[in-house]
A protein has these predicted regions:
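Conserved, single-site charged/polar hotspot
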Residues: 1-177
């Protein structure tokens, strides 16, 4: 249903279209099948908790993706007899964050690990964006309702890191966090 955002259909179609969105058809067979198992498990995990999985579906899946998904459809990842939480995303800046930092819930099988292939496969890995201090001043002052000092080097101070070396907290010119 377009207005409610609810999609219904058979599992093969939904998982195939999810896989098509996440990895497309350019990866090797085993990578596509692994994504299919993760997507299927994610949907079943949500259903088992009385929730609806949030997935993005391609308009259609290629015949190759559909065929590979069909080979593994129904296979799932379990932890202690229940469907595992199998969140997925394209890149993690070289290291994942633990579930406890992302979801505020500990899943012992979702710990921070190095992801050395991000640099090889993520087109944005290592990219940088630059903004003028005037632009940043305007955006920050407008959003936070504060007046920044004259020294841009004081505007952002990291006060704590989480696992994966992600920023856990920061101070904005000593006035907001």
């Amino acid at each position: 249903d377009y207005y409610s955002g609810t999609i219904s259909g058979d599992a093969l179609d939904i998982v195939s279209r999810t896989v098509m969105t996440e990895v497309g058809s350019g990866f090797n067979d085993e990578a596509i099948k692994a994504q299919a198992v993760a997507a299927y498990t994610n949907i079943k995990n949500n259903e088992s908790r009385g929730s609806t999985a949030s997935v993005i579906l391609a308009p259609q899946a290629s015949s190759r993706v559909r065929s590979l998904v069909k080979e593994v459809l129904g296979q799932a990842v379990y932890y202690n007899g229940s469907y595992a939480l199998t969140t997925y995303y394209a890149s993690s800046a070289g290291r994942t964050a633990s579930a406890s930092n992302v979801f505020n819930t500990d899943y012992p099988y979702l710990e921070s690990v190095e992801t050395p292939f991000d640099a090889e496969y993520d087109q944005y890995y290592g990219s940088e964006s630059y903004f003028s201090s005037d632009y940043m001043r305007s955006a920050i002052e407008s959003y936070y309702g504060i007046t920044l000092s004259s020294n841009p080097e004081n505007w952002f101070v990291i006060t704590a890191y989480e696992d994966g070396q992600y920023v856990g907290s920061m101070s904005i010119d000593g006035q907001a966090s």
